[in-house]
Regions:
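Exposed acidic/Ser/Thr-rich ligand/metal-binding surfaces
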Residues: 2-234, 298
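Short structured motifs
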Residues: 8-13, 221, 272-277, 291-292
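OB-fold and OB-like beta-barrel modules that bind single-stranded nucleic acids
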Residues: 26-28, 290-292, 307-309
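Local beta-strand/beta-hairpin segments that build beta-sheet-rich folds
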Residues: 91-93, 287, 301-306
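Extracellular adhesion/glycan-binding regions together with long Ser/Thr-
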Residues: 258-284
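Low-complexity, intrinsically disordered segments enriched in Ser/Thr together with acidic residues
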Residues: 279-300
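Long, acidic serine/threonine- and proline-rich intrinsically disordered regions
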Residues: 294-426
């Protein structure tokens, strides 16, 4: 596998007479097969909520989705299953998939509903099981819950009992450092979208919403297709600029595809900016958008920075590989005329849709329904410019409900969050 790495500015031409110019830098990355390369072995862990609220049809449909996923695993793939409620336990220890029927039987025999929702304990066991099969494989977890983690009790400055939500985020970050990807699936209407989004973002995965039980099979299959497309893992973007070029200070970099995520930026000992991206898929670009400022440089085509990807290749069992160093160009001219890039504009709009929705949610939390409605209407208009008709429907519906004095249901809130993060075409 090799890395496809392309960069572009929203406007390639820069006014050389200006002391400072702002630009949006789009960086797209994907894995490229070299010759005939087979799909990488998978190392999957399913972390499933078996609390009492999941009993009956919800659990039955989840088990149906799990069985269909098992049927798609290939020889050499690995599976493990964790169940959690008031406590967490290993249902299927990490193993090579050889006898699917035996695994399915164990799932049916060992499943049982109980009280409580200790998400962090389930996630911790899942990480432990995944680590048993990481060599030469794509290691990912599917974490499904229909509830909220136990936050314990806080009295003034003292925390009494474990804060499950806080520990979940710590574990997701730990998983990312161990080259494990955590995907989250919210089931029904009563799960914590803030928590599951943060877990997926920190764990390099994606957030899915199962509104009705019959959607479980579809959402599991959608995530599984993404896992099958992974060609390279543990990818980090290395970004450096020439003197006079810098990142914006506030929220300078975000991923805009395949999901929108605000990305944390670190700086290494050499001053290079480092961003963890996670897995790179074949034929599906991961797109990052950086907000940069350019100082004055001489007229002509100038190198304003360099890009490189550091990654692992499971097929070769090699870590820390580097793609060729790629220059970033801008054309400085005193006879400035815009040279706009329509693809970068799409990336700008994707990020705008997400941030506009975030602002709407913040206003709603403060009781400003009118302000929230205005921002959701703006986000719907942005989605219309992108051509994301499904998001337009969701965002417009939420805006309209607020405009006429109605509250957003839990389902509305979750649909709105998903619409803000993704292009709803899958």
């Amino acid at each position: 596998m090799k890395v496809k790495l392309i960069s572009a500015l929203n406007d390639t031409n820069v006014d050389a007479a200006q002391v400072s110019n702002q630009r949006q830098l789009s960086i797209s990355m994907s894995a490229i097969p070299v010759g005939f390369e087979q799909t990488l072995p998978l190392n999957l862990c399913l972390i499933l909520d078996q609390s009492g609220s999941m009993s009956g049809e919800p659990m039955n449909t989840v088990m149906q989705a799990v069985e269909q996923l098992l049927d798609q695993l290939k020889p050499g793939d690995r599976i493990s299953v964790i169940a959690f409620a008031g406590t967490a336990r290993v249902i299927i220890p990490n193993q090579i998939v050889s006898d699917r029927n035996s695994i399915k039987t164990q799932l049916k025999v060992k499943r049982k509903a109980a009280g409580g929702t200790v998400i962090a304990e389930g996630l911790s066991l899942g990480i432990t099981e995944l680590l048993k099969g990481t060599k030469g494989a794509v290691s990912q977890a599917f974490l499904l819950t229909d509830g909220h983690g136990d936050k314990g009790l806080q009295i003034w400055k003292w925390q009494i009992g474990p804060n499950d939500n806080k520990r979940c985020l710590q574990l997701a970050k730990k998983a990312a450092k161990l080259n494990l990807t955590i995907n989250t699936l919210g089931f029904g209407d009563d799960w914590n979208q803030n928590l599951l989004e943060k877990i997926a973002d920190a764990g390099g995965g994606t957030l899915a919403y199962i509104e009705n039980p019959e959607q479980a099979v579809t959402q599991f299959a959608r995530l599984f297709r993404r896992v099958q497309l992974v060609g390279l893992t543990n990818a980090h973007l290395l970004l450096s600029f020439v003197p006079g070029v810098r990142l914006a200070e506030l929220k300078p970099i975000a991923q805009v595809a395949p999901d929108t995520i605000e990305l944390p930026v670190e700086t290494d000992a050499n001053g290079t900016l480092v961003l963890r991206l996670g897995d790179l898929m074949k034929d599906v670009e991961r797109v990052v958008l950086a907000n940069i400022y350019l100082g004055q440089l001489p007229e002509g085509k100038q190198v304003i920075g360099h890009l490189q990807i550091r990654y692992d290749d499971p097929s070769l069992n090699k870590q820390g590989l580097l793609s060729p160093l790629a220059p970033i160009y801008a054309n400085f001219t005193k006879s400035y005329e815009p040279a706009l890039n329509s693809q970068v504009l799409q990336s700008i709009l994707l990020l705008a849709k997400y941030r506009q929705t975030q602002l709407a949610e913040a206003k709603l939390a403060l009781g400003d329904a009118k302000g929230a409605a205005t921002m959701l209407q703006t986000a719907a208009n942005t989605a219309l410019q992108i051509g994301d008709s499904s998001a337009v429907t969701v965002l417009q519906s939420s805006a309209t409900r607020l405009q006429v004095g109605k509250e957003l249901s839990k389902s509305d809130q979750k649909k709105t969050r998903i619409a803000s993060k993704t292009v709803l075409k899958e």
